[in-house]
């Protein structure tokens, strides 16, 4: 079972709204959402720039004040938007509900066509909160941590723009796992098992399983296979690519360059992402609908990255 709890009926005083401004319908949906919530006696707030663009600058709050005031956050965008908000709010432990304005919408629970129904379900307590495991990644150079970040989906270590292989040597809790020569490796959460890892041959892992996945990317050997590892383990990836570009990406959105001899350390993050889910919609139903039943333009999926890796 996924770690969940029923929130039950609770009078929500303030709901935050996060908006991806690049989505054509985002501001219109945000305006409608604001009206419906205020009609029901719920206050709303936004990020300062979004509030200003909507014409309500008084509703814009900086992050710390935003996080201290809201009890729940609605996210208007796609999966990429939700990933960014999950990373931003994880340390505040605020539940988030995604409204899909993107292409795939695998992580988003609600559709904007059912906006009023979704708001009613939230205000009546008709939902559960799922605790999704997150990752913390550190780049270690000459014994010192030089970069770090957290991920909900995955941490990718990959070659740069030229078609030359890199070598990744993996250790779990100091024990040698294997050496992977190819395009790189992915360390993912169960939530991320349906993302980049899946396209590289990794398994779909039920979100409630406490595990980490290690998936090779185009490994140049017949014996390299994805591995499912304990969630409490510490994974060290030693990278080697003399005179070649390589880098690390976090949820496909944040990137750092790597150098020969760097170590990427990945472990479970101390906080979980709190995702709002409907009780009558199962993970397997979403898998069937999103990954089997829909025609997806793969050239556009994942196009919501907020940043590009610098390699």
What are the roles of these predicted feature ranges?
Residues 3-72, 84, 113-128, 139-149:
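ATP/NTP phosphate-donor binding region
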Residues 89-99, 104-106:
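Gly/Ser-rich helix-loop-strand patches that form or flank binding pockets
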Residues 157, 173-176, 225-311:
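ATP/nucleoside-binding phosphotransfer catalytic cores, i.e., glycine-rich phosphate-binding loops
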Residues 179-182, 186-223:
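Gly/Ser/Thr-rich active-site loops/lids in small-molecule metabolic enzymes
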């Amino acid at each position: 079972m996924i770690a969940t709890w029923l929130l039950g009926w609770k009078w929500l005083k303030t709901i935050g709204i996060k908006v991806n401004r690049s989505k054509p319908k985002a501001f219109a949906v945000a305006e409608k959402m604001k009206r419906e919530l205020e009609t029901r006696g719920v206050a709303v707030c936004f990020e300062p720039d979004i509030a200003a663009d909507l014409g309500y600058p008084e509703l814009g709050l900086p992050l710390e004040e935003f996080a201290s005031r809201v009890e729940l956050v609605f996210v208007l965008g796609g999966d990429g938007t939700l990933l960014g908000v999950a990373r931003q709010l994880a340390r505040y432990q605020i539940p988030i509900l995604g409204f899909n304005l993107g292409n795939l919408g695998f992580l988003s629970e609600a559709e904007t066509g059912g906006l009023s129904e979704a708001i009613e379900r939230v205000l009546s307590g008709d939902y559960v909160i799922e605790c999704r495991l997150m990752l913390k990644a550190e780049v270690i150079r000459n014994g010192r941590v030089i970069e770090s970040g957290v991920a909900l989906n995955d941490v990718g270590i990959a070659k740069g723009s030229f078609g030359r292989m890199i070598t990744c040597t993996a250790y779990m809790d100091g024990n040698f796992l294997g050496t992977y020569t190819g395009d790189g490796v992915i360390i993912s959460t169960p939530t991320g098992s349906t993302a980049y890892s899946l396209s590289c041959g990794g398994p779909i892992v039920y979100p409630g399983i406490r595990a980490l996945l290690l998936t090779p990317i185009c490994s140049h050997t017949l014996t390299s296979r994805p591995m499912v590892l304990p969630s409490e383990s510490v994974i060290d990836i030693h990278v080697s690519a003399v005179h070649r570009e390589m880098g690390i990406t976090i949820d496909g959105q944040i990137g750092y360059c790597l150098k020969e001899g760097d170590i990427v350390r990945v472990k479970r993050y101390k906080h979980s992402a709190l995702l709002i889910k409907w009780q009558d919609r199962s993970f397997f139903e979403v898998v069937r609908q999103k990954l089997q039943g829909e025609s997806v333009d793969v050239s556009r999926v994942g196009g919501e990255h907020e940043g590009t890796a610098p390699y």
